[in-house]
Amino acid sequence: LKQGGFVRYVAGNDSYQKATVGYNTGMKGKWGASILLDYWTAHRKYARGTGGEGQSYFVSVGYKPNDRHQFNFMLFGAPQEHDQNYSKPLVTTKNSNGTINTPGYDITGRKGNSNYGFYKGEALSLRTNYYHKPVTNLNWDYTINENASLSTVLYASMGRGGGTGNLGRGLFSLSQSG
């Protein structure tokens, strides 16, 4: 691998922005390393209340003590969080007493989001997804002879993810909060 790096910035509609930095050392003697960091954000997306942000990272360090053995340690992940515009009816539904049950597109418009609003002056989304499950591994490649090789991988992946909302069967949900 050759030594080198790059920096990139991308912007799009509805406030989408992404910046990426990457660098590779090339092989320096018996060692080599690569890194990539990425960040994106979009807080004014097409539908109100659907903003989010996330990162991506990749780190790899390689070691080649001789022509028969190669080792590589790698870590990568992509934490993210974003709000949702959960499905809504085309037409507003009302309760038997005439109060609005679920506002539809006829009230909110195409960019509307019945899961988003303001509470005490702060934006609040009832539906937010979050996720981060990094993966790390250690590879060992061994050339036994001209006709045989052995490749082993030890890896681990632990993380968390989920979402918020007032649907489901939990001990407590937003619909029960009064």
What would you call each of these model-derived segments?
Residues L1-R8:
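A beta-strand signature from Gram-negative outer-membrane beta-barrel systems
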